[in-house]
């Protein structure tokens, strides 16, 4: 087993070799700007390492590479289209490129974080190509093809080096997380049954939620890592939903215990409360719970406990299948077929995304107008850096710190780049080996710093490689270096100023939208089984976003968790279908979800609670048991009591 320092050294070597190999192949194939291939190889490998705080998994590097290829091709096509249509109106063409960058940033803020890189990249790629060909528009197609070729070459080198030199498979980490999943679920159940330590419940719940979503992210990396894992990926998809279901069941048992302390029989309480320390003990405890359930019978037991034991049994079966990756058997296939495909919900960050797009469009447009008005020689580089920083920084959890990272990197790149540009690179023109060694040393040092998430490390690597004249043939005019370095620094500074000046005050609006989506998900459980879909993963993703936006708001978190529990109880309840009333309930929930004005939302919420109450009264007149109707009454009561959280 390698020590952490050895792992960091291994990744730094792989990063260095990938950058040097892409540079050598760029010179060998006669590409005009081999620095783009070297920069691509460095960024594709270093960005996941910076995000992970260590050596990334092989699947993450390949996924990042595919996103970069898609974004580059999309941006190149947009640049070609704009150049063909507006070649006689350069000002309008550049402003439309700025608008395209803003639209791409807006769209990237609406998709999932791991997919947003392609859209953000396509925005500033179009701007780079158009600005580079502004003086010679007849070479636009050649430049677009060359840039795509250099990008693909850098990605191929990064993936090839990672594959050949000790690739880090995510399968071992998946097995570790999956192996301890049943133990974590059982400990959460123990905390919920005990119910005395609320902080322990919150910690255990939060850890399991994070593990479940981390497992879903690792599943995407595993799918790209090798063609050997399709069965494991299918099982992991079902495990993700099943883990969230067990968490919800445990929280439902906690609420049941709070309302009815004697709901669980004494034998179950004693068996659940007994300590467990290892996954093997958790497996044996699950077998004992199953035997006790068979001996006791399902009468006078909470449905949540019965569902938890059944779900834990299915989870243990899938865990064994993930570890062995054997062929899916008949019983396991039935378990997987029972799992409904997750159904996504619309993004609740529409206002936040609009502000992000506005920031990029405004910053790049002002930079373009100032460049064209002043004729500043470094204006093009400044405008491109504004687009790059605003497109990428706004999708990070802390955009201000991301912009500071770029600014620090551009400041450090000035003396480092000057040393390379004026002394080292001119002295290595007669020896390709010395050139590779000098650039490899720079990449190696940055690779070590990136894994430790040093402030400015990513920006230093990207900015230094960008300002060096790694072209074919190479030249070293000092004016070009000064323009490029100053343009980078001013662009990063202006991007930071825009992020600070254009405030994002969408936090409260996003919080209300999240609560409305959770309420809509709870009401959607009343739909017919074939139309409701599996909303549980989407609801928990929104709950995590709510915790990110309001980390100290325990009341809002409790309300959101209650809505998710009610959604599961309604989804598994045996309520008869009244098509007319369900359509009215669904229409009111849709009106509440769509928002509008305060009066419109208030009216929709009032109509929704009224319809839910009428539906419950109608079912009561039909002789439906009060225990079956309890979740329906609870949902109507929760929506009415907490209406101020859902409304403006």
From Swiss-Prot:
UniProt-listed InterPro entries: PHBA_efflux_AaeB/fusaric-R (IPR006726), PHBA_efflux_pump_AaeB (IPR023706)
Any single Pfam family the record assigns to this protein: FUSC
GO CC, any one term: plasma membrane
Record field: transmembrane: 11-31, 41-61, 65-87, 91-110, 125-145, 150-170, 369-389, 406-426, 430-450, 458-478, 481-501
One of the GO BP terms on file: carboxylic acid transport
Molecular functions (GO terms): transmembrane transporter activity
Keyword Repeat: no
Bilayer topology: Multi-pass membrane protein
Keyword vocabulary terms for this entry: Cell inner membrane, Cell membrane, Membrane, Transmembrane, Transmembrane helix, Transport
Subcellular location: Cell inner membrane
Family: Belongs to the aromatic acid exporter ArAE (TC 2.A.85) family.
Purpose of the protein: Forms an efflux pump with AaeA. Could function as a metabolic relief valve, allowing to eliminate certain compounds when they accumulate to high levels in the cell.
NCBIfam families: PRK10631.1
Name of the protein in its database record: p-hydroxybenzoic acid efflux pump subunit AaeB
UniProt organism field: Edwardsiella ictaluri (strain 93-146)
